[in-house]
Regions:
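Short intrinsically disordered, low-complexity coil segments enriched in acidic
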Residues: 1-6, 152, 178-179
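Polar low-complexity intrinsically disordered regions
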Residues: 6-7, 22, 35, 119
C-alpha cells in the first residue's frame, strides 16, 4: 500500500477495481475458457486471484528439473547475443545465472511460485505437469489438463505448430533478446 491509499483507505473502491480487471481485460474475447500465461502463483498474485477473479482459480503448473532449466538458459544466452542476460555486462556464465537466480530473477520467481503452489492449501487449485511428460507424452498430458479443467477433450495437433497468434496479435519475445 502506498501513501495515497494510506491517506484515503477506500478498500471497497479498490476491491471494485481489482474485481473488474480480469473481466475487462478479456471482455472482447469470445472464449469460455482462457489459459493465461503469467505469474499467477506468486503469493501476492494468487491471493488477489482468489479474492477477485469471481470464480474458482485453476492453475496449470509446468515444472522442469532445475539443472535442465539452467542448461536451457545457458544454451540460449550463449547462442543469442541479444539475450537479456548478455545486456548486463556479466562476464561469465555464473554471473549470468546469478542474474536469473537472484531473489528477483526470472528463475527464482518461478521457483517461488511453484513452492507456493505446492502448499497443501493451494494444491487443489493446481495441476502439475512435468516438462518431460508434456514433450514425450503430449496427448495424455493434455487429457489430464482437460480433466482438471472439467472440459471435454478433443484431439490436438502436436507437430508443425504455428507461432501463437490471437486477436490479431502474436507472441513477441524480442524484448528478451530472441529473434
Amino acid at each position: 500500500q502506498d501513501d495515497v491509499f494510506k491517506n484515503y483507505p477506500d478498500h471497497k473502491s479498490l476491491d471494485n477495481v481489482l474485481s473488474s480487471v480480469y473481466y475487462n481485460y478479456y471482455k472482447d474475447w469470445s472464449q469460455d475458457v482462457i489459459i493465461d500465461r503469467g505469474p499467477a502463483l506468486t503469493e501476492g498474485n494468487f491471493k488477489l486471484l482468489k479474492q477477485h477473479l469471481g470464480q474458482p482459480v485453476k492453475c496449470i503448473v509446468l515444472w522442469r528439473d532445475l539443472l535442465d532449466v539452467l542448461a536451457s538458459y545457458i544454451k540460449w544466452f550463449e547462442n543469442e547475443p541479444t539475450a537479456y542476460p548478455n545486456q548486463y555486462n556479466k562476464k561469465n556464465i555464473e554471473e549470468k545465472l546469478h542474474l536469473l537466480m537472484k531473489d528477483t530473477g526470472a528463475i527464482a520467481k518461478e521457483l517461488k511460485g511453484i513452492e507456493h503452489a505446492m502448499k497443501p492449501e493451494n494444491k487443489k487449485h493446481c495441476f502439475f505437469i512435468r516438462y518431460e511428460d508434456l514433450v514425450t507424452q503430449p496427448e495424455p498430458t493434455m487429457k489430464g489438463i482437460y480433466e482438471f479443467l472439467e472440459m471435454d477433450y478433443y484431439p490436438h495437433r502436436f507437430h508443425s505448430l504455428n507461432q501463437f497468434n490471437f486477436n490479431g496479435l502474436g507472441h513477441d519475445d524480442s524484448d528478451l533478446g530472441q529473434n
